[in-house]
UniProtKB/Swiss-Prot annotation:
Interaction with KATNB1, as annotated region: 64-189
Subcellular location: Cytoplasm, Cytoskeleton; Cytoplasm, Cytoskeleton, Microtubule organizing center, Centrosome; Chromosome, Centromere, Kinetochore; Cytoplasm, Cytoskeleton, Spindle
Protein role: Required for organization of the cellular microtubule array and microtubule anchoring at the centrosome. May regulate microtubule organization at least in part by targeting the microtubule severing protein KATNA1 to the centrosome. Also positively regulates the activity of the minus-end directed microtubule motor protein dynein. May enhance dynein-mediated microtubule sliding by targeting dynein to the microtubule plus ends.
Residues with the Phosphoserine modification: 215, 231, 242, 344
Protein's recorded name: Nuclear distribution protein nudE-like 1
Region named Required for interaction with PAFAH1B1: 114-133
Gene Ontology terms: biological process: cell differentiation; cell migration; centrosome localization; chromosome segregation; establishment of chromosome localization; establishment of mitotic spindle orientation; lysosome localization; microtubule nucleation
Pfam families hit by this protein: NUDE_C
Region (Self-association): 56-166
């Protein structure tokens, strides 16, 4: 306190009271300051303890954060290495995939070319198939015709068998007629000596006409006829059936000639049928080879039609050599084709 602030006292009591009052005032302020100091110290201690606790927590947190930071650094390093490794692998995979893509594109181009070639080949094969189908239909049609013709010829063959039976029966009848003719000639020789001359001449003329008609075969007769039909001179005396009239004998011989001519025609048809069957078998094998070649080359095979309508005559029918038929027994047989083998009955 400055000396200028001290007032002037009139008495000692006033000065003493002033200083007492001033000391009390300072004492009170000191007490308040000390209380405030104590409060401040207590508050500072509490604050210091709290700050120390916060510091400990902060240090612990800092250590944890540092540990986390270090761990994260390690993880970052590991991730960097892993990323670099993955990047290298992905780069290798991308390069491999690019190579595969280029190869795949090349293969795709080749496959496109191959598909186009296959389509062209398929078109060629379809055309060849259509041509082959047409050829096979034609062949089947001709084969069906041949089958029908074979069936017809088989029916004719059956008819020929029945005719052969009839021919054999007629041959037997002709042999009997020849035997009867021989007996009749002998009887006429006997009666010629005893009868007058004019009736004998008439009988001789009639018998010579009948013998001439019997000596001429109804079919072409060859060397085998001499063995099959014995001549009247070679037949010994025997007992025949009842004698027939000359007209009946001539009609019977005409029937035999017609039957033999029919048998010859049937045998020629049978030979033609056999040759046709052989020709069809060889043609079928030839056609199968040509069809396979046509499928490979894309061209259908065209088959030429050849009609097997010609009849083949035999060199000898039932052992007879070909000879012109006698007049009055019908038209002659069709001409025979060369190289045909005879069929024996």
């Amino acid at each position: 306190m400055d000396s200028e602030d001290i007032p002037d006292f009139s008495s000692l009591k006033e000065e003493t009271a002033y200083w007492k009052e001033l000391s009390l005032k300072y004492k009170q302020s000191f007490q308040e300051a000390r209380d405030e100091l104590v409060e401040f110290q207590e508050g500072s201690r509490e604050l210091e303890a709290e700050l120390e606790a916060q510091l400990v927590q902060a240090e612990q947190r800092n250590r944890d954060l540092q540990a986390d930071n270090q761990r994260l650094k390690y993880e970052v390093e590991a991730l960097k290495e892993k990323l670099e490794h993955q990047y290298a692998q992905s780069y290798k995979q991308v390069s491999v995939l690019e190579d595969d893509l280029s190869q795949t594109r090349a293969i795709k181009e080749q496959l496109h070319k191959y598909v186009r070639e296959l389509e062209q080949a398929n078109d060629d094969l379809e055309r060849a198939k259509r041509a082959t189908i047409v050829s096979l239909e034609d062949f089947e049609q001709r084969l069906n015709q041949a089958i029908e013709r074979n069936a017809f010829l088989e029916s004719e063959l059956d008819e020929k068998e029945s005719l052969l039976v009839s021919v054999q029966r007629l041959k037997d009848e002709a042999r009997d007629l020849r035997q009867e003719l021989a007996v009749r000639e002998r009887q006429q020789e006997v009666t010629r000596k005893s009868a007058p001359s004019s009736p004998t001449l008439d009988c001789e003329k009639m018998d010579s006409a009948v013998q001439a008609s019997l000596s001429l075969p109804a079919t072409p007769v060859g060397k085998g006829t001499e063995n099959t039909f014995p001549s009247p001179k070679a037949i010994p005396n025997g007992f025949g059936t009842s004698p027939l009239t000359p007209s009946a004998r001539i009609s019977a011989l005409n029937i035999v000639g017609d039957l033999l001519r029919k048998v010859g025609a049937l045998e020629s048809k049978l030979a033609a049928c056999r040759n046709f069957a052989k020709d069809q078998a060889s043609r079928k094998s030839y056609i199968s080879g040509n069809v396979n070649c046509g499928v490979l080359n894309g061209n259908g095979t065209k088959f030429s039609r050849s009609g097997h309508t010609s009849f083949f005559d035999k060199g000898a029918v039932n052992g007879f050599d070909p000879a012109p038929p006698p007049p009055g027994l019908g038209s002659s047989r069709p001409s025979s084709a060369p190289g045909m083998l005879p069929l024996s009955v």
